[in-house]
Amino acid sequence: MTTNETTSSLDALTSLSKRRGFIFQSSEIYGGINGFWDYGPLGVELKRNIKQAWWDDMVRNREDVVGLDCSIIMNPRVWEASGHVGGFSDPMLTCRQCRRHFRADHMDDLIAQSDWIASLAEAGDADEQGMLTLERGKLERWIRKRGRKQAKGMALVKDAETHLDAVARTIGEAPRALRDVLVVLGMPGLPEDSDPMPCPFCGGDLTAPRQFNLMFKTHIGAMEDHSAAAYLRPETAQGIFCNYRNVLDSYRIRPPFGIAQVGKSFRNEINPRNYTFRSREFEQMEIEFFCHPDEADTWYTYWRDLRYNWYVKLGLESSKLHLRDHDPDELAHYARACADVEYDFPFGTSELEGIANRTDYDLTKHQEHSGKDMRYFDDQTRERFIPFVIEPSGGVDRAALAFLTEAYREDEAPNDKGEMQKRTVMKLHPRLAPTKAAIFPLVKKHGMPEAATAIYEACKKAGVTTFYDEKGAIGRRYRRQDEAGTPYCITVDGDTVSDGTVTVRDRDTLAQERIPADDVPAFIAKSLQCE
């Protein structure tokens, strides 16, 4: 997929999400706030359905996983023990010209998405190995036509007369990789204590990387001093570790067992981007599964495969879903093994969920800092040990974005006159669809609204999330529900009044069938159960 196609695809999804009430920018009437998003009527139902599907499949329908709901603000010593206070940071770069901040380890992605870098590469000549040659004349034309608009912060662009000859000679010596070309372009006037790469947004010079702690800090009580400092949790996992002994002592359960939690977390991301994918406020679905150290590798493989298949069962195309094991040099300091479930988003392949073997790191750290014994005594084997932990950790917001991306389709369907027209349809898995069925009276007379209302009430009573709509041509009503991802549309017409049957239209196949009106709730419920 090209950069333009990627942007177009994400723009189309973003537009539909706002138009149909899936996702809104937070505080939009005041210009919004970067890294925060609100979920509209359809979006909140989609998220609720994702969380419910996860809870049913990972907790309620299992005997070895129990739930927990921990406080967002915890004793700050928790984060000292876990290492977050001293080590939960990212390398940050700051552009001295445009004042943008971004993570140093995101530079490759930002280069790939940069407009001025793309136009620069197009101005040169690349060989089969991707090595770029940029002659003086072409560089000068790029500065004049594109650089002055797209890379205003670059010293070379601002003062080409002074720097062009030296830069052109260096670049012209031999073909270079794009990153090497960018470093040469950014060298003129570069201050000390700078990163060699120019800013991917404006071409300006960047500060050297410095560590930036990602935790949101707040204060408890009336005084804002060091003794009152606290943090919004950056992950839900530590609350589970702190309550491990409480669950073990109060609930009749023993290793191997898991503790699950769904909840909000907060990270002061340097550069939130890619729509809802990387936000400062987000929701997590996490399990900490406690097991004997000798069984950890087996349980790790089990949870890794289970979590991958869960996404496939809920509609993500396996060709776009990848299970990637981390190389040894990628592993976090606490992990023996880790795998990412990755998805092909419009902006690139990125992590949807991580599954890690965290060993006994967390429980050991909390035992050291709290003085509480985190060992488990097995009265059958007479062994005392600190359990190893397998952690499947997924994001609700990332899952929602993946399911929306996968569901978005453009195809053709007949209009009211039978003519084929382009339609946009969200082919969400029925378990996740915000609305399961829409009820339409064909016209607002002849007893049809009354009959449709009766079906609507019966569906609601049966627990089927239903939408009632009697406004507009039937074709336009179908289109609205297609964009909302509603699997079934039920139309009440003249035959309904005479013979008690209705038309059921399938969102994906467009097939229609007639069934008794009284059977609609059971038909919808059965169809959803079969998925």
Residue ranges and their predicted role:
Residues M1-E531:
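NTP/phosphate- and nucleic-acid-binding module
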